[in-house]
């Protein structure tokens, strides 16, 4: 085959391949029929020679280089409908044997293609992205990506010297997906997609479905296997239920602790070995991780992700993260992931204008640009975008064993006019401000997780009064399991910042939350958002001098742990870190030593005991979302800033919580209670153990049959200054109550008998009356 006659097809593809805009390479490259013979076409720009080998290494043909761009054509002696062949490629310095990617058929099944086009594939991550697989006995990686408006897409990496001309992909017009199987590419290989967009611009993009990514500032995706599914113990998922104690420790992995010698992060293994025992000892039931999906900028704390399917490489591999979660589960601790699906950054390697069009985002900046964060907003109305985001929830719960997702910035998702002035937003189809597509996305995702998530919960960070966030979609709700109670947090922190002298005038700030308490299933959050951007630490928000600040904080935590709703505390708050959180430094653990003067250790001990008491007494959690579980005992003592309420369990057992938000001891303070029994002070924030002044009730408290606050019984307390105390009631046994009732009845009968006049008494009285009447006459 020394001479070659060029066809129109040859000339067309020579131009397309050499100029790197070939959209249909499989129709030309690889094995094809040409009249009575078969030909194999190969495009390798740097090659000097190409030979065709049989499966056993026999040379079947030597290809002719028909164009200097690197196009080779080999004619075979007979026709083949299929052929297991290899390439022996000569380069200037070596000759190597290669598999030809263009001899392999697509592994994208018609049903998958159809479901992906429709946006209804439950697990698109099992198809899209980079998947290690064996095809026709050859191991390699199947790559696929959605880029419907691209003119050409190629996989590039170390395996082809990042040359976009070498491996153009197959285009599926019905779904907009490109795919190719690259033989002999192995786990750990770096890759990107080189996209020729409709405007003729080259874009180098990370894989939206990548399961691993390079460490910043590098941005390539990393070939790794799709993690195996994880079966989570039903007992752990049951711990997410509304009638269970949920106390969440919110953690930023990059700054919880660092290596002292170089201020560098702990890795996933080190975090597991230190964080989990600490959380267990502190009595928290859940860990909430600030976003760990891959993100380019440390200062975003993870809230501007570029790889939703890729755990950040800052702390190790995806398998290392799975190990951390497994160890948490072994310790009986559930793990919640902060999930950012409201926006994404404008980094050029990410989703922005992915194929030259506004593929993942809205084109109009009034819908697609978030001016507060300089980020782009997902187009939830597009089926493929919906599918990309919704399936990600299932990916984390199934493949990593995540027990819950906390959805970030829900308000910015569901309102089209969020943080926008008039004229800066586009109304929905009915002229309203609600983002109907975002609401539909949230409802359908929550419904899907209820069905497929095996007990994983979804929590909304939603800062407005949008109705029905935790109601089911069938009730016209959004379907979340829990919602952060931002209103309660803001009101109570404002109250605690006041000098105690002025608190009496704002008594309702501590009680108003009960007006809407049962409208949603609330979590009480003291999150990272409250200790950044000049807001100061939680300790810094408390009023008073040093002693008062710590006393106020302990009292406030006590009020919070007693109040209905699940609990969330950001790291550092458990020991009253004095300065704002800094993502680039470790927490101030030294404060728990001598430098902290004992104050911080006292708060740490208080939070630990709050958590343990919280888990011990079902009255403090079982009926968080049932009005039967809460009753005000003292709600109107605004002059003394005293609050008292009773928490009740399903079996009727109760715990009374009393708070005094002034620095004045309230001696002989009587509180009405509904039942007789033994009352015991079980927690006191003013105890010396917590660095308080040690005023208290010291054990059992006498219950008296004295009416107070509309109750038949009452107890008299000494309420310490700036404190919260917890009092448990052990009702008298039924037999004792019945015996007392019998004694009372017997006494009443005896009294009635003593007062009833006898016949002799009546006769004497009658005679005396008759004599007195006679004398009067």
Swiss-Prot record:
Cellular component terms per the entry's GO annotation: cytosol
- List the catalytic residues: 408 (nucleophile), 461 (proton donor)
Per UniProt, the enzyme's principal EC class comes to transferase
Which terms under GO biological process does the entry name? glycogen biosynthetic process
As its record notes, the protein acts as a catalyst of: Transfers a segment of a (1->4)-alpha-D-glucan chain to a primary hydroxy group in a similar glucan chain
The pathway entry for this protein reads as:
Glycan biosynthesis; glycogen biosynthesis
Enumerate the CDD domains for this protein.
Answer: AmyAc_Glg_BE, E_set_GBE_prok_N
Extract the Pfam families matched here.
Alpha-amylase (PF00128), Alpha-amylase_C (PF02806), CBM_48 (PF02922), GlgB_N (PF22019)
**Molecular function terms, GO-annotated:** 1,4-alpha-glucan branching enzyme activity; cation binding; hydrolase activity, hydrolyzing O-glycosyl compounds
Its EC number(s): 2.4.1.18
Keyword terms: Carbohydrate metabolism, Glycogen biosynthesis, Glycogen metabolism, Glycosyltransferase, Transferase
Q: Which SUPFAM superfamilies match?
A: (Trans)glycosidases, E set domains, Glycosyl hydrolase domain
Q: Which cysteines are joined by disulfide bonds?
A: none
Query: What's the stated role of this polypeptide?
Result: Catalyzes the formation of the alpha-1,6-glucosidic linkages in glycogen by scission of a 1,4-alpha-linked oligosaccharide from growing alpha-1,4-glucan chains and the subsequent attachment of the oligosaccharide to the alpha-1,6 position.
| Family under the similarity heading | Belongs to the glycosyl hydrolase 13 family. GlgB subfamily.
What NCBIfam families does its record include?
branching_enzym, PRK05402.1, PRK12313.1
How is the subunit organization of this protein annotated in UniProt?
A: Monomer.
Q: Which protein are we looking at?
A: 1,4-alpha-glucan branching enzyme GlgB
- What is the native source organism of this protein? Actinobacillus pleuropneumoniae serotype 5b (strain L20)
Question: According to the entry, what is the taxonomic lineage of the organism?
Answer: Bacteria, Pseudomonadati, Pseudomonadota, Gammaproteobacteria, Pasteurellales
